[in-house]
Amino acid sequence: MKQDMIDYLMKNPQVLTKLENGEASLIGIPDKLIPSIVDIFNKKMTLSKKCKGIFWEQ
């Protein structure tokens, strides 16, 4: 399920923006965790732009 969420956010970056603005939520994820998820995801994306690739642990 975690990998599905990551795939979805990578394919739909507008959802990440809506999460940041409080315009969307993730089913099954408490609202209080959303800022942490957005922060981590943004850090990973920033790092991936500096690298040739990014690898997710499975």
From Swiss-Prot:
Keywords: Competence, Lipoprotein, Pheromone, Prenylation, Secreted, Sporulation
Record InterPro entries: Competence_ComX_Bacillus
Chief location of this protein within or outside the cell: secreted
Example GO biological process: sporulation resulting in formation of a cellular spore
Proregion residues excised on maturation: 1-52
Modified residues (Tryptophan derivative): 56
Subunit details: Interacts directly with the sensor histidine kinase ComP and stimulates its activity.
Note: The DNA sequences encoding ComQ, ComX and the N-terminal two-thirds of ComP show a striking polymorphism, which determines the specificity of the quorum-sensing system in the different pherotypes of Bacillus. In ComX, the sole conserved residue is the modified tryptophan essential for the activity.
Name of the protein this chain belongs to: ComX pheromone
